[in-house]
């Protein structure tokens, strides 16, 4: 497997030079962040991004994400032109040698948390999701925005888009996803690109919106939409584990058995009451996920793709983009690499 690290471009306080100094680090997970959702990523912009990353001694491992326009998720008549644009972006990325694209099909919101700076007793801060707090949040107030999101909305825009989803239940969303998949995957397969859908985060309905990539059954249903290695998943163990009903190791094993794991996000979370959870340090003892067993599965199934430490705590006085500081994610990367070395040597 190839250790990689999320980088948010030139505006990211974590620099490529910082990232390169992390032991075993090989790849960068990044995107073009200023092209409006739904428009084609120009090939020259992709070339510039690639040159910037490679000048640091690293390479682009994965594009995360090429956002999916809401009109595609809503099944609106405009979706065909938007899907054409999406396909052209896939082709442009492939032409620059980029072969893995992470994306999601979450309506309106990307990953959602209720507190970006929950303080642990040791003074570190982390992202958390409190189920009871979430029930009191009103997304229509226009103030809800998180660091991982591709779009932010005014009150009027939010009200309109939430109203639009009133007629879209889970089955309708599945229909719209299937339409999208059957358009893009043959094109991705033809140019050697592996698509990797990210699970919903958290993997259950919030704010009355449908969520469909949520657990074992949905993974199996998803891969059956189109039979191709290019129609794969991002195995984000922290997202799947956020629902206490999910057995994340069972989901992981099944996804590997199906040969559809195209990218891995490895972060730990600590389950709380109901569906509440806190993001934790990566080592198993701090969370609810046995990270050793996750890495063991990666080795057992010969996973050679990119893996990245996911959200980290803010430690040692660091400030910046919540969840995406340098220090704790660097610790996570070295921990994961240590687990991998141990697994490989134990298997000999």
From Swiss-Prot:
The keyword Lyase applies. It catalyses: D-mannonate = 2-dehydro-3-deoxy-D-gluconate + H2O. The keyword Hydrolase does not apply. GO terms for biological process: D-glucuronate catabolic process. It is an enzyme of class 4 (lyase). Keywords: Iron, Lyase, Manganese. Belongs to the mannonate dehydratase family. This is Mannonate dehydratase. It comes from Streptococcus uberis (strain ATCC BAA-854 / 0140J).
